Every structure is written in C-alpha cells, then in structure tokens.
Regions:
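N-terminal Sec-pathway targeting helices
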Residues: 2-21
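Hydrophobic alpha-helical membrane-insertion segments, chiefly the h-region
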Residues: 20-31
Length: 461
C-alpha cells in the first residue's frame, strides 16, 4: 500500500477519482436537497385568532370562539379523524350539514352526524349506513353531483391504500346516493389489485370537479388522487344509462404540462421531489369559470405548496410554482362565499427555512381566487385578505393556546350556507385535558371576521 502511494501516477488517478466523487456528491446534494429545498416565499398575512376570546368581545361576535364537538369518541374511541361534509338542501330553509368521518387514523368504521342548525348542534351517530362502511380503509370524501337535467346524486369515495403489513393497495371504493343521502349503495371497488389497472390510491378523491364540454356543463367529473410513490392521477367519473358509476382509467395528469412560452413539459419529477399530494382543484369565477387551479401539499416541507392552472378542463396544466406562504399547508379545501371571496382551510405549515418548520394548527385563508392567480402570474405580493386560526390544536405538554400548535388536524369538511355562514369540521386535540383526538366544528361568517380583522389591523396586534 505504501508503494502505491509513492507511485505518482496512482496518486494522481486517486485524487482525480476522489475529486469526481466529491463533485458528484455536491451535485446530487444540490439537485436533491438545495434545488428542491427553497427558502420560504411570500409574506405572511395577519391572523384572526379564534382560539381564545379576548375580554370585551362584543356579544354578537362571541359565537366565533365557540368550538362545537361533533364526536368525542361516542363509541369509546380515543382517536377520530379526517371528516368531510356536504350541504344538503342548499338554498332552502332546511339546509343540513352532513358530516362523515372515520373512527381511527385513516382506516376504521365510517360514522355520520348531521346538523340542521348551521353547526350549533349535531345529531347522534346515524345507524342506517351501508355494512361495507364498517371496513373503510381510508379518509372518506363526499360530494354532491349536479346533472344537466337537474337531477342530483351524492357520492362517497374511500381509498384502499397499502397500509403497513398489506401486500398492495387495492383501488378505491365508491358509494352512491340518489335520495339526499338517506340511503347509500354498498361499496363498489374500482381499479383494485386484481383489475387490469391496479392502483394504490391515497385520499381519493382529494378533489372532484365538474367538467365542461365546449363551454357548457357536462355530466362528467374529474377526480384527483395520488399513490404511495407520489404519482398524481386523474380519473373521469361518468354514469351509464342505468345510473351506475364509471371511472376512466387513471392517468398522470402532470405529464401534460405547458410552459408560459407554449413548450410541452413533464412536471412529474418536480412533483415527486416535493412529494406533492392531496391536491385541491378550484374552478374560477365563483365555480362557474373556464379556468381550473390546483394547489397541493408539499410533503417534504422543503418547498411551499405547489400550484398550477388549466384552461382546457384539466387536459394540460401550466408549470408548477410555489404558492405564497400565506396558503402553505396540507390538505387544502376551498369554497366560495356569497360575496365572491374564497375561503380555504388547511393544516398550517410555517416554514422557518429550507429544512425547518412548525405548524399553527387549523387555519383558514380568506381572499379571492384572483389573489392567487396574480401571485402565480407575476410574483406580485398578492396574498389575500387575512388568515384565521379556527381553533388551537394542543401539542404535548401545552396547557394553553400558543402560536405553535399541533399539526395533526385539517382534512376539513367545508360548507357555505345560503346566509353566508361557513361551517368547518375538522379533527385534533382541541383541549389540553383529555388527550383525545376528536371531531369538532366551527361556524363563522366573513362579515363578522372582517370586523375582528379591522380591529386587528387598526391596533396592529
């Protein structure tokens, strides 16, 4: 060995090899850790904090601080999570918030409770549910479907992902209601492990948006989900002549992206580097426009949430860009309000730098669709109106609310009543004493939040 090191030729070759390894290592570090680990972008908005009611709060605003328990573990559960909600009988005097959730983390029996008074009180657990719902394997999502002829259906979707100990994922399950959620079909599986196109879905469908054809509404809906390799899929829902649901073969939609100059590009690599998932899809112009926006969770937390747009009903998408810090988070759920603004709930992710972060818990952004579009198009610091901390999620050892909060929350059901009330259902450790993770809801109106924000902006605190 000593003779080798005395050999100048060997030393030169060894030095060159080590230099090459160092350069390669630094290049890989840049490619996978620095290039895809960005500094946080976009300023922060002021936050209206509804976790603690200040002294002197006007009586008509006190309700904003009232968190309603939906299910504290009525069946003895210590952990309940991942609700979703749909509004029944919208625009009538009998509006009902229908909330479905799971008795466990992701997997477990599905439960349902309803509220007929805008989230002030909730029913007991409904008992006339499909037998197959007792063995749900993942987060449920529920949507109302409106048809061209005026007919309505409701659809509930629950994925079958590859949990630890499972050999594979097993597609996604679907139930349909045609009677205002009074009854449901049993689960029907699509794209399971024994199908021609086996899939391993997670959070199916994180979004389900109605599509247009030639500018007019069609009886088609685009559903989005991801798998355990962070491949992002779309599948198109239609119904046959007998009213049975059909889903098109899933396809990776970010392969069909286009740069600002019109050049085709594949955004799947960037999506995988960020571990983009749980994508929400929002239609412009109060849900009536011809543009779609997607925004999703950057699971590495080394980039902000990512956004893109489509003007051809999801056939192609613009390049992915980071969203502003004001909406950085996980499992975004967006709805329009009667005044044309948008509310978006999510699990807060506050990035302190390239590699560190904390959460402020359960957050709702208030702004306009156009605010986020301006940010995307020009980098203009268009961040929206303000944020709302809906409730405090307690970290271990916390005895009172603070800025930093638990991150095991979000996955909200969000409905907007005809009078403008917004009912948000979520899950979390909402008290310091019980140690339980349970389902709760908060009801707010933007006109009342605006009053609190005006006071906040005036005092600067």
């Amino acid at each position: 060995m000593k003779k080798l090191f005395k050999n100048k030729k060997f030393v030169v070759i060894l030095s060159a090899a080590l230099s090459l390894l160092l350069i390669t290592g630094l290049s890989l570090f840049y490619a996978f850790f620095l290039r895809y680990s960005t500094t946080p972008k976009g300023g922060k908005l002021k936050t209206v904090d509804l976790s603690v009611m200040p002294a002197g709060t006007p009586a008509d605003l006190e309700y904003l601080y009232d968190l309603k328990v939906i299910d504290f573990g009525d069946g003895g559960e210590e952990y309940m999570a991942h609700p979703d909600s749909v509004l029944l009988n919208p625009g009538t005097e009998n509006e009902i918030v229908y909330t479905v959730y799971v008795g466990g983390h992701g997997k477990g029996p599905l439960q349902v409770k309803t509220s007929s008074d805008g989230g002030k009180t909730y029913s007991s657990r409904l008992t006339s549910l499909p037998k197959s719902w007792e063995k749900s394997e993942e987060t449920p999502t529920v949507y109302e479907l409106q048809f061209v002829g005026g007919e309505k259906k409701w659809i509930l979707i629950s994925a079958n992902p590859k949990w630890p100990g499972y050999l594979s994922g097993d597609g996604f399950n679907v139930s349909v209601s045609t009677d205002n959620c009074e009854t449901w079909t049993e689960f029907q599986k699509f794209y399971g492990k024994d199908s021609d196109f086996p899939t391993n879905p997670i959070v199916a469908m994180s979004a389900l948006v109605r599509l247009k054809e030639n500018g007019a509404w069609a009886d088609k809906w685009m559903g989005l989900f991801h798998d355990n390799k962070f491949r992002l899929y779309k599948t198109i829902l239609t119904f046959d002549e007998d009213g049975n649901p059909n889903w098109s073969q899933p396809e990776e939609y970010l392969k069909n992206s286009v740069t600002a100059s019109g050049k085709k590009t594949d955004q799947t690599f960037l999506a995988k580097m960020a571990k983009l998932c749980e994508v929400e899809c929002v239609r412009s112009s109060n849900g009536q426009g011809d543009e779609l926006m997607i925004i999703g969770r950057s699971n590495t937390k080394r980039m902000n949430s990512l956004m893109a747009y489509s003007t051809d009903e999801g056939e192609t998408w613009t390049e992915l860009k980071e969203a502003p810090a004001a909406v950085n988070g996980e499992r975004h759920k967006a709805e329009y309000t009667p005044d044309g603004r948008m509310v978006m709930t999510f699990r807060s992710v506050e990035r302190d730098g390239r590699f560190t972060w904390h959460s402020e818990g359960l957050v709702m952004w208030v702004g306009k669709y156009e605010d986020l579009k301006k940010w995307y198009d020009s980098g203009e610091n268009s961040l929206g109106d303000y944020r709302v901390k809906l409730a405090h999620v307690y970290l271990s050892g916390q005895t009172e609310p603070a800025e930093k909060a638990g991150s095991d929350t979000g996955y909200c059901g969000v409905v907007v009543l005809s009078d403008g009330r917004i009912v948000v259902s979520s899950y979390g450790k909402f008290d310091a004493e019980s140690g339980k993770t349970y389902i709760a809801s908060k009801t707010v109106k933007l006109e009342d939040l605006d009053k609190l924000y005006a006071k906040l902006a005036k005092t600067g605190s």
